[in-house]
Amino acid sequence: MLPAQHKLTSPRQFRRTIKGGRRAGTRTVVVHLRFNDGEDAIAATGPRFGLIVSKAVGNAVVRHRTSRRLRHVCMSLMRDGVKGTMLPANVDIVIRALPASGEATSERLERDIRKALSTWDI
């Protein structure tokens, strides 16, 4: 489970990250990244993550399994960082699961997310 301070909670936070940030995609996920500015950056206690897992991924069981796997990857990213560097505290990341993610393994999801994040210098 992600700690509360590392979650995007409001629709406004999701919208700002998706509309105002950068995007990179793979076969299983699309990753949106946005650096906070102003008050959000001052109050940042670490990177914040949001997940979007729609019905296109599968039935409720598949969606929840996919969400659990994605949350595990987020915890791994907070612990290990990307390419050996820790994620900055002032970054918001939204991970949108594509239909192929319902059949993907945890290792595949982590590899795809790390690949998408490595396209940016963060």
UniProtKB/Swiss-Prot annotation:
Catalysed reactions, as listed in the record: Endonucleolytic cleavage of RNA, removing 5'-extranucleotides from tRNA precursor
Keywords: Endonuclease, Hydrolase, Nuclease, RNA-binding, tRNA processing
GO molecular function, one term: 3'-tRNA processing endoribonuclease activity
The keyword Cell membrane is annotated on this UniProt entry: no
A biological process from GO: tRNA 5'-leader removal
GO CC annotation terms, alphabetical: ribonuclease P complex
Pfam families, per database record: Ribonuclease_P
EC number of the protein: 3.1.26.5
Family in the record: Belongs to the RnpA family.
Role summary: RNaseP catalyzes the removal of the 5'-leader sequence from pre-tRNA to produce the mature 5'-terminus. It can also cleave other RNA substrates such as 4.5S RNA. The protein component plays an auxiliary but essential role in vivo by binding to the 5'-leader sequence and broadening the substrate specificity of the ribozyme.
HAMAP family cross-referenced by the UniProt entry: RNase_P
Assembly and binders: Consists of a catalytic RNA component (M1 or rnpB) and a protein subunit.
Protein name per its UniProtKB record: Ribonuclease P protein component
Organism per entry: Corynebacterium aurimucosum (strain ATCC 700975 / DSM 44827 / CIP 107346 / CN-1) (Corynebacterium nigricans)
Lineage of origin: Bacteria, Bacillati, Actinomycetota, Actinomycetes, Mycobacteriales
Gene: rnpA
